[in-house]
Curated annotation (Swiss-Prot):
Annotated gene: murA
The protein, known as: UDP-N-acetylglucosamine 1-carboxyvinyltransferase
Keyword list, A-Z: Cell cycle, Cell division, Cell shape, Cell wall biogenesis/degradation, Cytoplasm, Peptidoglycan synthesis, Pyruvate, Transferase
Residue numbers binding phosphoenolpyruvate: 23-24
Active-site feature positions: 116
Any one GO molecular-function label of the UniProt entry: UDP-N-acetylglucosamine 1-carboxyvinyltransferase activity
Length: 421
């Protein structure tokens, strides 16, 4: 199993980094390509394990898939309608295959998905939405099976709770439904907006993405097209926090400030100098004092839960005491005990973590527990005294494109190695 060896330093992280395309947009876009009857080209797709798994799944379904810079998908040859357990057991996003399959082919089945173990993320909302569009759903032998005679039917759907995943499932399926679908209490994340842009490029008629009401006028077919995936706002935020906690200055390119306004506001509150341009963001912490901030995670445009672990680390290194409240997922403070192994001061009380400040962390052997928490451990290792070993880094590879290379280019000392038995 691969690990990171991180040599800590008091030297600030300095330099420039190019941000990859958003995993959370690239995945639904690749799954949405199932809806098309002609070839599609998707640019700015990150090099990640989940992307590779998705491309392999599309091939298993019969699509022609190749990557040469962009990802090219020809879904016209799809003739299988099952996403099998051996492929999807590690990836929760696989549920996104179900809506496009039943919408285009009248049938589909997906093995109940895996992914990060950060609380209950049930597929109930996906299933309910597809049922409201007219699909018959059954759970058999660990598979979610969907079927419809003829086309799905447009409907007025009010979501019980805001869900990014279910919003994408319903929006994708409704593109080929007969009639108009109105989706209320929809999630508003930029990745949903990007998925809608992709579908509209293929001929869909979607309006309102980015608001809490999305309207989809069903069309009979989708054609081909080209699309570039939006920047990864979480990767952007991760590198900006790395600059802040190390007392450095980092410029992130190929990203946009409007994607993470809540994060930038908190970085400014923490004492950082934040500057932005059309396609870049910089954080300068040189000679400035890091101050703790209070954070409450919330659906977009609120503070993203995927930045919570990074700001937990920031609060541990900042002056004063900061309180972080997690409202999206339970069981998402698994990074806190690992950071405490490095000397951090923090107490978990229900869905909040209260951080005290420490002068400097000490190296330790720590274990990555989920995708975003893993990044906070790597950054902690960069600023700790001594040599930190981060175990189970396959979590990181699921969401960050060459994170060690990008951090090393800023002055970090991170080595990927495989421990021999």
């Amino acid at each position: 199993m691969e690990k990171f060896r991180v040599i800590g330093s008091t030297q600030p992280l300095m330099g420039e980094v190019t941000i990859s395309g958003a995993k959370n947009a690239a995945l639904p876009i690749l799954f949405a390509s199932i809806l098309a009857e002609e070839p599609v080209e998707v640019a700015n797709v990150p090099h990640l394990r989940d992307i590779d798994t998705t491309m392999e799944l599309l091939k298993r379904l019969g699509a022609k898939v190749e990557r040469n810079g962009s990802v090219h998908v020809d879904p016209s040859s799809i003739d299988e309608y099952c996403a099998p357990y051996d492929l999807v057991k590690t990836m929760r996003a696989s549920i996104w295959a179900l809506g496009p399959l039943v919408a285009r082919f009248g049938q589909g089945q997906v093995s109940l998905p895996g992914g990060c173990a950060i609380g209950a993320r049930p597929v109930d909302l996906h299933i309910t939405g597809l049922e409201q569009l007219g699909a018959t759903i059954t759970l058999e032998d660990g598979y979610v099976k969907a079927h419809v005679d003829g086309r799905l039917q447009g409907a007025h759907i009010v979501m019980d709770k805001v869900s990014v995943g279910a919003t994408i499932t319903i929006m994708c399926a409704a593109t080929l439904a007969e009639g108009t679908t109105v989706l209320d209490n929809a999630a508003r994340e930029p990745e949903i907006v990007d998925t809608a842009k992709f579908l509209n490029t293929l001929g869909a008629k979607i309006s309102g993405a980015g608001t809490d009401t999305i309207t989809i006028e069903g069309v009979e077919r989708l054609g081909g097209g080209k699309h570039a995936v939006v920047a990864d706002r979480i990767e952007t935020g991760t590198f900006l926090v790395a600059a802040a906690v190390s007392g450095g200055k980092v410029v992130c390119h190929n990203t946009q400030a409007h994607l993470l306004e809540a994060v930038l506001a908190k970085l400014e509150e923490a004492g950082a100098l934040v500057e932005t341009g059309e396609d870049w963001i910089s954080v300068d912490m040189t000679g400035r004092e890091l101050k703790a901030v209070n954070i409450r995670t919330a659906p977009h445009p609120g503070f993203p839960t995927d930045m919570q672990a990074q700001f937990t680390l920031l609060n541990m290194m900042a002056k004063g005491g900061g309180v972080i409240t997690e409202t999206i997922f339970e069981n998402r403070f698994m990074h806190v005990p690992e950071l405490k192994r490095m000397g951090a001061k923090a107490e978990i009380e229900g869905n909040t973590v209260i951080c005290g400040d420490v002068e400097r962390l000490s190296a330790a052997q720590v274990m990555a527990t989920d995708l975003r928490a893993s990044a906070s451990l790597v950054i902690a290792g960069c600023i700790a005294k001594g040599e930190t070993i981060v175990d189970r880094i396959y979590h990181i590879d699921r969401g960050y494109d060459k994170i060690e290379n990008k951090l090393n280019a800023l002055g970090a000392k991170i080595e990927r190695f495989r421990e021999s038995n």
